[in-house]
Design a protein with these regions (language model features):
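Exposed beta-sheet edge and beta->alpha loop/turn motif
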Residues: 82-132
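Hydrophobic helical h-region of N-terminal Sec-dependent signal peptides
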Residues: 6-10, 14
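Short solvent-exposed beta->alpha transition segments
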Residues: 22-26, 30, 40-87
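Positively charged n-region of N-terminal signal peptides that target proteins for export
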Residues: 1-4
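Sec/Tat signal peptide C-region and signal peptidase I cleavage site
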Residues: 15-20
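Residue-level detector of flexible, active-site-proximal loop/helix-junction positions
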Residues: 11, 50, 126
């Protein structure tokens, strides 16, 4: 009987992890879709309270993304990679190809709030030949 409960517990935990992973991917995809429509108000809604506090308005946030993260603003291709946990935060790794064909590895730091998963920051690295 102990083995049965252990198996059920593992299944429940795995199911929760899969649901969280799907929710995280949905948030990132939805924000990218909003950027593609230049809908910075909607894109801003997917940012954490910390990020919203840093930029104050959707317009300022949109300008930052357009100028600092053009591969996110206008990606040619988006591929979700692994999900990791680091320092209590969930990290979703994403490979993005920009309009010029250059590959970038992005680490989306996600936090879970009362509103659901939100983006708390993005770290970008140009992908080398080994990551393509």
């Amino acid at each position: 009987m102990k083995h049965f409960f252990a198996a059920v517990l593992i299944w429940v935990m795995a199911t929760g992890a899969v649901k969280a992973n799907d929710d995280v991917k949905s948030v990132i995809s939805s924000q990218i879709d909003a950027f593609l429509q230049d809908d910075f108000v909607t894109a801003f809604d997917f940012a954490s309270p910390m990020i919203q506090g840093m930029f104050g308005t959707p317009e300022r946030f949109g300008n930052m993304v357009r100028n600092g993260y053009p591969m996110v603003w206008r990606p040619a291709d988006v591929e979700f990679l692994s999900t990791d946990e680091r320092g209590g935060a969930l990290i979703q790794n994403v490979m993005i190809k920009d309009a010029g064909g250059k590959l970038f590895l992005l680490e989306y730091e996600m936090i879970e709030t009362e509103k659901g998963w939100l983006i708390n920051g993005v770290r970008v690295q140009e992908a080398g030949d080994g990551l393509a």
